[in-house]
Amino acid sequence: HGEIRIAFGPDEEIGRGADHFDAKGFATDYAYTMDGGVLGELQYESFNAAQITYKITGVSVHPGTAKGKMKNANMIAAELASLFPEKEVPEHTEGYEGFYLLHNMQARIEEAEMVYIIRDHDKEKFLARKKFAEEVAAKINEKYGNVVEYELYDQYYNMGDVIKEDKRCVDVAEQAIKNAGVTPIIIPIRGGTDGSKISYMGIPTPNIFVGGENFHGQYEFSCLEHMTKAADTIVEIAKLAKK
């Protein structure tokens, strides 16, 4: 086989595993993240991802004399949340369907903070979702005065938009999975990997299965036999890449 290079992204789960990745020093034509799920999974499309944090400033007054004075940040936050589409959430979407997720929230009468993540595979829909998230704040401010401030930033983009331009890395991985005696399952990631960022650094980086399931929950597990097949797949990739 040819030269093999390995990198570790210790901050992947907080979305920063590739922030300081030295793509120039890594110097490969393509790469793979070992961050997939079930046996045979091969993914080269990810979400476009953004996060918006709303900060709501309320007015606290003794409840006995609060009429016409109190601005309850708890209630304003609840109203803001109600403006998002009820069915466009993770528990009601699949495949290429995007969503909004209220990731965490802290609130009391005087102030509230809400963190939403925004996801969509389609770039235009992603832009529309971000615009909608900003419009939500504008609607609340129009009703209650300027009580909402927000910070919106992009986290990563759909690596498929890069990889589709040259799918050799996908073709090699697909054949390698077959050579390992496994049936490839090519599906979009309903999430992101370090490859979502690395692909935009000039190294197309699809994602390969590792045998895990039920990620980010109390029922998460990995299958040792499937992990072994993932290792076999990497060996097969090394063989094919030399050709």
Where do the PLM segments sit?
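Alpha-helical metal-binding/catalytic segments enriched in His/Glu/Asp
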Residues: 1-13, 52-56, 62, 67-87, ...
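Acidic/histidine-rich catalytic neighborhood of metal-dependent amide-processing enzymes
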Residues: 1-47, 89, 93, 97-103, ...
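General structural feature for long, well-ordered alpha-helical segments within catalytic domains
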Residues: 2-3, 17, 27-28, 73-76, ...
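Structural motif
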Residues: 4-5, 29-32, 52-53, 184-185, ...
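Metal-dependent peptidase/peptidase-like ectodomains
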Residues: 23-75, 122-178
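Short beta-strand elements
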Residues: 51-58, 103-107, 118, 207-210
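His/Asp/Glu-rich mid-to-C-terminal helical/loop segments that flank catalytic regions of hydrolases
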Residues: 71-89, 124-125, 130-136, 171, ...
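Active-site-adjacent substrate-binding region
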Residues: 75-92, 99-101, 147-148, 157-206
